Amino acid sequence: MTEHVYHALLQMLVQGVLKRGSVLRIDLLAKTLDVSPTPVREALARLATTGLVQHEARRGYTIAPPLDRKQLAELMDARRLIEVAAIGRACENGCAAFLADLEKALDTQRKAVEAYQSQKDEGGEDLAWQVMVADLRFHHTIFENTGNRFIRVMSQALSAQLHRIRQSAQAGISDDRNALEEHEEILAALRTGDRAVAERAMEKHINNVERRSELDLTD
């Protein structure tokens, strides 16, 4: 139950359903999600570790302010350090099953982007969320194939922080097609079996994400 509530609140935070700076009342959230207060309290405590919400002794849980440019730079630097190394290791461990899993993740992302593009002018908040989930799934597939459990744990913490980029953006998703094209380049690089080629493709992707994210940040 806590896992379900966590993801429901995460989606509400990233989509802007819960407004920045507002106090998150456990009783009201429990009523909205039709659950008891306990899983809401547990989910908020977990969300506090991501930086999406913060806890103050007398106010309770509130939505955190958006990332500033220094925080974004630090986060993207962490991505470069972890993800470039991870794809290098995954490339060394590469096998047909891994590439098939990555192709499947990419196909899911492709369909999500197409669905979002066809309906984004009519709202499409849930479709935008599916694009974000599919994007992360692609990266998780790489982490899962490093053969290193600690890298996988680090990836989970990193993914939670990446949601703050979306939360901090001025509006929705603006780079879904760019990210898809870059993921296609990453898969093509992995198919070469050349670690250096794969690492360069990932570094290029992260650099581009950082540049686009800087443009999307609120001042």
Regions found by a protein language model. Give the residues of each.
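Short arginine-rich
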Residues: 207-216
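Conserved amphipathic alpha-helical segments that form helical-bundle/coiled-coil interaction surfaces
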Residues: 92, 96-167, 180-189, 197-208
